Swiss-Prot record:
PANTHER family: BARDET-BIEDL SYNDROME 7 PROTEIN. The lineage of its organism: Eukaryota, Metazoa, Chordata, Craniata, Vertebrata. SUPFAM superfamilies: WD40 repeat-like. The gene is BBS7. GO terms for molecular function: RNA polymerase II-specific DNA-binding transcription factor binding. This is BBSome complex member BBS7. Keywords: Acetylation, Bardet-Biedl syndrome, Cell membrane, Cell projection, Ciliopathy, Cilium, Cilium biogenesis/degradation, Cytoplasm, Cytoskeleton, Disease variant, Intellectual disability, Membrane, Obesity, Protein transport, Sensory transduction, Transport, Vision. The modification N-acetylmethionine is found at M1. It comes from Homo sapiens.
Amino acid sequence: MDLILNRMDYLQVGVTSQKTMKLIPASRHRATQKVVIGDHDGVVMCFGMKKGEAAAVFKTLPGPKIARLELGGVINTPQEKIFIAAASEIRGFTKRGKQFLSFETNLTESIKAMHISGSDLFLSASYIYNHYCDCKDQHYYLSGDKINDVICLPVERLSRITPVLACQDRVLRVLQGSDVMYAVEVPGPPTVLALHNGNGGDSGEDLLFGTSDGKLALIQITTSKPVRKWEIQNEKKRGGILCIDSFDIVGDGVKDLLVGRDDGMVEVYSFDNANEPVLRFDQMLSESVTSIQGGCVGKDSYDEIVVSTYSGWVTGLTTEPIHKESGPGEELKINQEMQNKISSLRNELEHLQYKVLQERENYQQSSQSSKAKSAVPSFGINDKFTLNKDDASYSLILEVQTAIDNVLIQSDVPIDLLDVDKNSAVVSFSSCDSESNDNFLLATYRCQADTTRLELKIRSIEGQYGTLQAYVTPRIQPKTCQVRQYHIKPLSLHQRTHFIDHDRPMNTLTLTGQFSFAEVHSWVVFCLPEVPEKPPAGECVTFYFQNTFLDTQLESTYRKGEGVFKSDNISTISILKDVLSKEATKRKINLNISYEINEVSVKHTLKLIHPKLEYQLLLAKKVQLIDALKELQIHEGNTNFLIPEYHCILEEADHLQEEYKKQPAHLERLYGMITDLFIDKFKFKGTNVKTKVPLLLEILDSYDQNALISFFDAA
């Protein structure tokens, strides 16, 4: 059965954060529900639909930005009390809008996530978790990395309090009191947690989580260990998951899974006989989906998925059909309803046009006044700069609450801009004088009308580090622009991982000297992505990384006065040696640097590069042949005389050209890495082999793996 849902936009509030919209439970089954939402202006608004119009139940005065909104109440009763987290304060409202709670937590950081279960309140700021009962402090935990979400397994079903933290270092931490009972390693940084079926599933221990790289999974949190149930990979390369809900939208008696992503995608998964999720419906909205819930808002008896978006739109995807079939005599009634709606919209439009004219006149008068001061309009930007493991590129996502006019990208390090299918903006490049002003890239993206979200893909070169800047100009008057900066790190293509292969041939770099644990940690933060800014607890720490481009690995272990870095790639060790010695020199710290080079690792790295290089050379060769083969096809009329390999190239011509276009300079990047490997191998021996690089490039042009390995050995 196909699921058909029709979109209805209800109203727009201010910019919203993740998980800040809820539906208040209805008094009877499938009756219309009220929507409550909190925004960045600090306003909490509750509204319901009457005769197709949004009617406010209550609206609070502006205040600090609302980071979370949850519903609570006595356990096993309807959860209809509204709780909001703003700055370090929790406020509670009844469903009529009367404030009954104001609780100042005195946290040093702003609250980022909240969960409520009866009289228990679970809060997390960036690194700190707190548990309160009846507003009294119960438990506390300091996390090693940022906490993205917090939840507690249902107390009414398990008779124990089991909070779970979703942490940026790809770990779910299961707590007991103030201690970690156990940690669950997950495939990506978890961004959102939700109880399966809204109640923890059959066992009460089933927990859903979504990751920033778009994976979705179900896990059972038992008292002793986690049990993994299923995991959905992000094969369609969709956005990160921001919100999850369980609701029977299909109407088969089994709750479906509702998912909202940061690229605007709304998905519905049903469960098959084996309890595995199957995608039943998806729809793309134009901006990120911050909250999602199933219920009934627009009309009695019509179920719908209600979502809120970044810019504050509350939208319903409803089962109510747009085209209704009517019996005799009913036609007039439907027409009358439609006429009323059209008339109401017309009046609203006229009122807005009149208001715009008035404001324009006021602006003209005030701008001619000698006392007038020009005010720069403020606007919010939701941005995300993340490394994609699949293609070793960075995604830069810029989302603005109003339409974007243009975005200027400037970089002081060499980077490649890659093609993005979803991107409809027109890009133009300006010539740069990199020697005189450190500009390696100047590109302008001009957006089409009403574009509020822009996605770019960037590939950096390891060893070259600096800053990427985005100048975002929206379509507002007077013209104004915001600048966002993103650091390209020396080992920018490395990603945190839970395990590495210790049997690989490793090169070792050891640093010793008079430096503190915090200082060596700050150097590692400077060099590598996905390392927490605060030094972890304890005297010694180990991080594992994988190079997303080459699949080489890095182990980093450090403590006060000592740092040990191991990698199967000599170039990684060389970059670390150069950057760390430069950072130590800046701080006037004497470093003793020693290294052990494993000759076998060079051959091992070349073998890792081999399949990638071979594939890219073959792709380039095929693309070069396409034009000649097409010309032959036109001249000869048919291609029966061609060998099967050439037939295949002609048939796949469009796909091959698209793939080649998506990966500009891929071959040059691989050549560059092999050249760096060659130079670095001999640099550690104290030999300069730069004069032999032209010979190496000749060998690469007529590539043969054995010849290349022999050249490395003979040089």
